[in-house]
């Protein structure tokens, strides 16, 4: 996906609750721990796409709010930050 666009979409829709940096805004909302989570999927962006589309626990589903390509771009961006 388009990482630059994914960063823009992330900033506009996800950054209020999530951080992709090691410094955490809130313990539960940081994606820093996603590095180990994402490693379980061997770089498969589909797991991120699924969670963003369908939501989980307190996180709302963005499937009706964002276009499929925007969600794919967010997944690419998050995965790029997870290293």
UniProtKB/Swiss-Prot annotation:
Instruction: Say which family it is in.
Output: Belongs to the cytochrome c family. PetJ subfamily.
**What's this protein's name?**
Cytochrome c6
InterPro entries referenced in this protein's UniProt entry, alphabetically: Cyt_c-like_dom (IPR009056), Cyt_c-like_dom_sf (IPR036909), Cyt_C_IC (IPR008168), Cytochrome_c-type_DH (IPR051459)
> From which residue to which does the signal peptide run?
none
Q: Which cysteines are joined by disulfide bonds?
A: none
GO molecular function per UniProt: electron transfer activity; heme binding; iron ion binding
Self-association and partners: Monomer.
In the record, which positions carry N6-methyllysine?
A: 24
Q: Name one GO biological process term.
A: photosynthesis
Report the Pfam families cross-referenced here.
Answer: Cytochrome_CBB3 (PF13442)
Mind naming one GO cellular-component term on file for this protein?
chloroplast thylakoid lumen
Q: What does this protein do?
A: Functions as an electron carrier between membrane-bound cytochrome b6-f and photosystem I in oxygenic photosynthesis.
Subcellular location as annotated: Plastid, Chloroplast thylakoid lumen
Q: Which UniProt keywords apply?
A: Chloroplast, Electron transport, Heme, Iron, Metal-binding, Methylation, Photosynthesis, Plastid, Thylakoid, Transport
Q: What happens to this protein after translation, modification-wise?
A: Binds 1 heme c group covalently per subunit. 50% of the molecules were found to be monomethylated at Lys-24.
Does the keyword section mention Chloroplast?
yes
List residues binding heme c.
Answer: 14, 17-18, 59
């Amino acid at each position: 996906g388009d990482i630059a666009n994914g960063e823009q979409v992330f900033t506009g829709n996800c950054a209020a609750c999530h951080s992709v940096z090691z410094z955490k805004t809130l313990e539960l909302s940081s994606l820093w721990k996603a590095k180990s989570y994402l490693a379980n999927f061997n770089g498969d962006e589909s797991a991120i796409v699924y969670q963003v589309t369908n939501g989980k626990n307190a996180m709302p589903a963005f499937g009706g709010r964002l276009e499929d390509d925007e969600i794919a771009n967010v997944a690419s961006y998050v995965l790029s930050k997870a290293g």
